[in-house]
A protein has these predicted regions:
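Cysteine-centered metal-binding/redox modules
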Residues: 2-203
């Protein structure tokens, strides 16, 4: 085991069962809500005319981003060490920097993540591909993201803290990969790459 792996193992070992369970429930709630919206979007997609597909793609992307596990309630470290304890004793703060520090791993990720959402929201141009291709891409993105969210819910109960953080990082990466970035302008692709880069140090 590398020194870094040992540090992460030690950080995760400090989390108690109650905090881990609270974070699990927070993640599951987000997955359940996302699946609800994805099923709704799936039913509506077939009725979306070509001139509305770009707007639909933006809505899908923002709904997905808004339901990913990035909030404090989905992090066992934030649950245990946040609020009243002000991050004192937090193993994630020790290994990745305090989340309220501008240069911490989480701050750099959430800044890039928020910028991606802003770029998608402000992308009001037209489709960058043929409407038929856009529809197929959206069908794939919705179907695949729904499966990933369901898998995440199924996996999460049996995971320890270290495994949960690893699984969450992988889930974030997989879901962000399913954004229909090909349908948007070049700024979205650049923002997407930045999020990917910041995810390398998420855990």
């Amino acid at each position: 085991m590398s020194d870094r792996a040992k540090e992460l193992e030690e950080a995760a070992a400090s989390i108690d069962a109650a905090s881990l369970d609270t974070a699990r429930k927070g993640i599951v709630t987000g997955c359940q809500e996302l699946i609800y919206w994805l099923e709704l979007l799936s039913r509506r997609l077939e009725k979306v005319p070509p001139e509305k597909q770009h707007k639909f793609a933006r809505a899908f992307s923002l709904i997905m981003l808004g339901h990913l596990p990035t909030r404090p309630g989905t992090c066992p470290f934030c649950v245990q060490y946040g609020q009243s304890r002000s991050c004192r004793g937090c193993g994630y703060a020790t290994t990745h920097g305090r989340c309220d520090s501008d240069q911490s791993s989480f701050s750099l990720f959430i800044e890039a993540f928020s910028e991606l959402g802003r770029a998608i929201y402000q992308d009001t141009g037209g489709l960058n591909c043929h409407p038929d291709d856009a529809r197929l891409r959206l069908e794939h993105c919705i179907r695949s993201s729904r499966l990933l969210a369901a898998d995440m819910m199924e996996d999460i109960d049996s995971l320890c803290t270290r495994e949960l953080m690893e699984r969450k990082a992988r889930y974030l990466e997989q879901m962000i990969d399913l954004l229909p970035k090909e349908l948007f302008g070049p700024e979205i692709m650049e923002s997407w790459r930045r999020v990917h880069e910041m995810l390398r140090n998420y855990w």
